[in-house]
From Swiss-Prot:
Subunit organization: The complex is composed of two ATP-binding proteins (NodI) and two transmembrane proteins (NodJ).
Keywords: ATP-binding, Cell inner membrane, Cell membrane, Membrane, Nodulation, Nucleotide-binding, Translocase, Transport
Family: Belongs to the ABC transporter superfamily. Lipooligosaccharide exporter (TC 3.A.1.102) family.
Gene3D superfamilies: P-loop containing nucleotide triphosphate hydrolases (3.40.50.300)
Membrane topology qualifier: Peripheral membrane protein
Gene that encodes it: nodI
Cysteine disulfide links: none
InterPro entries with a match to the protein in the record: AAA+_ATPase, ABC_transporter-like_ATP-bd, ABC_transporter-like_CS, ABC_transporter_ATP-binding, ABC_transptNodI, P-loop_NTPase
Keyword Nucleotide-binding carried by entry: yes
Protein name: Nod factor export ATP-binding protein I
Record-listed ATP binding positions: G38, P39, N40, G41, A42, G43, K44, T45
Biological role stated in the UniProt entry: Part of the ABC transporter complex NodIJ involved in the export of the nodulation factors (Nod factors), the bacterial signal molecules that induce symbiosis and subsequent nodulation induction. Nod factors are LCO (lipo-chitin oligosaccharide), a modified beta-1,4-linked N-acetylglucosamine oligosaccharide. This subunit is responsible for energy coupling to the transport system.
Cellular component GO terms, alphabetical: plasma membrane
Amino acid sequence: MPEAAIEFDKVKKSYGEKTVVDGLSFHVAPGECFGLLGPNGAGKTTTLRMLLGIAAPDAGTIRLCGEPIPRRARVARARVGVVPQFDNLDPDFTVRENLLVFGRYFGMSAAQCRAMVPPLLEFARLESKADARVSELSGGMKRRLTLARALVNDPDVLIMDEPTTGLDPQARHLIWERLRSLLARGKTILLTTHFMEEAERLCHRLCVIEEGRKIAEGAPSALIASEIGCDVIEIFGPDPVALRDELAPLVERTEISGETLFCYVIDAQPVHARLKQRADLRYLHRPANLEDVFLRLTGREMQD
């Protein structure tokens, strides 16, 4: 593998008058899990399309597995596995047949395809479903099959768009466990996700983008420390604006989202004492997390 598995350098992309990606730069090291986070319309999908050579950038440089994109996208994609946001499995085939057919797309012989199926079924924990139709699988099983299919060519890099969207918590945790096993084997993962817990658990580093521009980058723990840096008390009740004014002298800063007041505190005791006098309020005291960072950077009303 080259020094960087993925390189984006000052990449721009517009559609008509709308700039979708605006000078975006990031790199992903071999063996790293790197997350792209951003609200809907931030440019994440366009970024992935350019990385795979499906869309050409208007400016900037892209390299995937050391290959210039889009000029040598076909060569690079031979070393890449892709997990799309929505499962595109063939419903007319069994679990085993979906893997066999996909292997032939990479020029593998019939014998090679047959040999790679058992370990992939074991990886996806689908051994007992090898001859089941796709329509017979649960959502979590379909997602694990899609992940196994992306590994048919033993790729160096996995590109995953919202890998656990629509899954229940148990299925989501199983996917996370499988992804951690891939990282332990030295695979490189680039993923987009709306689940902040997913990003915090899996990603070594993150890039937060909004309107096609990078607004923050770093390790999850470092971003939490730099952007939040203290505990959070969520308060649920009537008139959050009046409550904000009441508590302002006791907290570092506040944010309002709907009917919820977020108080950022270094010393929580004075706030707790005040809240205990208010039977009409419910509250939760917790450590800051990546969701606080994401919402602060991309869209919640901030009050200093």
